């Protein structure tokens, strides 16, 4: 254990301020970051890592992008927080509406975290419908509100408050539309909303089967329940209009975060104004936040979204993904090792299971011990993946060919080492 991490453990529970950072799922001492630039971070021991976590998907442009940094420095001279509506909020809202192609009957409410945004979306659904039940899907993560933390690894850490929330939340298997439809046929009149990730990123990367997302949204329309698409991970990452655009769907409520803030804390709820105008002060559903719409986060977010709009940005990301991951897939296929590499856009996961998972139960069949050995080997070579077998890793536009070539070789060598192919 490093000296700094020992000191961190004196001050923070588990030495961290968010649990997965402790790296216990991969059985390593977590690195303590000293600085970061582009696709790498350097730890307190002066070791360089190629970063495929990127602040859990927030840094699609890499660390310390010069345009984002310059805008923040300039904005800081005008003030770090106002507690009032600012010009920066309005300009950023205009940018988002243009980028997402939102109609004029939509509105947005800025917040600071994804958890705040999902909690607000659920509060809207319950407040407007007067119904108590929220449906989510097993393995999908929507923040740390008790409403969302039903299944492992979260349930055993949430004690009595979670038990009180359980009767109001139903968790169903992802991708099982017949079961979902059966439940909605029985309980739909009590369901305020259904919240879902369009592409799962917190049980590893798991894709929806054909027509699942469309079916969920259509069923919500039929029962008068709100469909809530959590695009905290996929928004601004998988396409200009997010996953909603890729799947050609129109959920009732959209939730954004991560990339939205350009590396600073920002999130948002977006919906038609007949929904959003139920929020205070226009309506009676309360939501507030001291740092909501923080001017520096708005500035960083606006630059981040502008960079995503540059010609060929998503084509560039797709090329990076293809060049980096295809040779690894080829190695897995030709050697016959029991590993599945799942990728979607610039998200990817290694499942130590020969079969592609469709839900949490499938993902949990993975060989966790083998994943840990793989992770530890890659980490020792300076490749930092998201430190859990059930978390997505991320590519960014900042990943250079040199870094990708090195990481590709390191990951292949690590797979060979785990399965004694060398």
Swiss-Prot record:
SUPFAM superfamilies: PLP-dependent transferases. Its cofactor is pyridoxal 5'-phosphate. GO terms for cellular component: cytoplasm. The keyword GTP-binding does not apply. The keyword Cell cycle does not apply. One of its GO terms (biological process) is protoporphyrinogen IX biosynthetic process. It is found in: Cytoplasm. It comes from the Bacteria. It catalyses: (S)-4-amino-5-oxopentanoate = 5-aminolevulinate. One of its GO terms (molecular function) is pyridoxal phosphate binding. Its main location: cytoplasm. Keywords: Cytoplasm, Isomerase, Porphyrin biosynthesis, Pyridoxal phosphate. It is an enzyme of class 5 (isomerase). It holds the Pfam family Aminotran_3. Its EC number is 5.4.3.8. The modification N6-(pyridoxal phosphate)lysine is found at residue 258. Homodimer. HAMAP family: HemL_aminotrans_3. Belongs to the class-III pyridoxal-phosphate-dependent aminotransferase family. HemL subfamily. NCBIfam families: hemL, PRK00062.1, PRK00615.1. This is Glutamate-1-semialdehyde 2,1-aminomutase. It comes from Chlamydia trachomatis serovar L2 (strain ATCC VR-902B / DSM 19102 / 434/Bu).
